Amino acid sequence: AKDFMARHGIPTAAYGKFTDIDEAIAFIHDHGPPIVVKADGLAAGKGVIIAQTFAEAEAAVRDMLAGNVFGEAGHRVVIEEFLTGEEASFIVMADGKNILPLATSQDHKALEEGDRGPNTGGMGAYSPAPVVDSDLHERVMREIIEPTVRGMAADGAPFTGFLYAGLMISPSGEPRVLEYNVRFGDPETQPVMMRLRSSLPALCLAAIHGRLDTCTADWDARAALGVVMAAGGYPGSYDKGRAISGLDAAAESGCQVFHAGTTLADGNVVTSGGRVLCVTALGNTVADAAARAYRGVDVIDWDGAVARRDIGYRAIARERESERQHQDG
């Protein structure tokens, strides 16, 4: 993906690939910490080090190349500039040529409030993402999404399906690509789908037949927010088979409860994974959607259930600031 972006002029973090320790360390000294050192390959999700000092970065390189602590995955390292700013998820549909953007969203990857703790698959999300205003939306389409779809076609692999660009928006408003996925995001999908009024199967059929240029997507103007409820211990080891209560009460409160790590045992819904449920609600504002979603979270329970209590905090802060400015004006 990094080579693809370099080839097609798509903005991303500066990077280099190395098999030689001295060359890797020279790159580190050229760019300086904090810097990201990755084992180039599969390393059970643990082959990524965010080094805060030169010493940490050099140690990571030596471990991965000389010590080879990650086995085959560590025979080469990718070293990337560490990007700062605010993340956003930008998902579109493509039919090989035409592009239909879907609603913007933002997820929360860290386990704990304030974006602290280990990274997870995602502890909650909301849509739309206020950080992506109309000007930035146009820029992302022009500088990232359109060159990506054109680039895949030019490389002989025209793409039909869902394209997910994970973006970092710098403090000055510059979008850069963190990652691509050729699927929807989880948990971004849940709030995005809550807002979609158009027929998803009809849009998928249009993409398959190369007719996305004839389609538009109709969105509920309200915000949607989803809170992931996870098993205690996740993303590490956790218990399974815990009986879940309160699902009917959450539905009666107006929430949509999306199941992930659940199964049926003797007629009862029990936990079967790390991320168990995503409790999602619509609201006139992100703050309103959050309040409704947390009402659902508060009536669902099982032994060891955990959830972040601050999903949507960036957008809620923006809403409060906007309201304050309106009152002052």
Predicted regions located by residue number:
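Generic C-terminus detector
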Residues: T262-D266, T271-R324, D328-G329
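Short amphipathic alpha-helical segments
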Residues: G45-G47, L225, G273-C278
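Conserved anion/nucleotide-ligand pocket segment
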Residues: G32-F54, V192
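Internal nucleotide-binding/catalytic subdomain
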Residues: G47-T189
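Short beta-strand/turn micro-motifs at beta-sheet edges
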Residues: E112-G114, T214-T216, T262-V269
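Conserved N-proximal alpha/beta basic substrate-recognition cap immediately N-terminal to
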Residues: A1-T12, E23-D30, V36
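Short, conserved charged micro-motifs
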Residues: E23-A24, E56-A59, P235-S237, N284-A291
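Active-site "cap" helix and flanking loop/linker of ATP-utilizing ligase/carboxylase catalytic domains
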Residues: M141-L163, N181-E252, A265
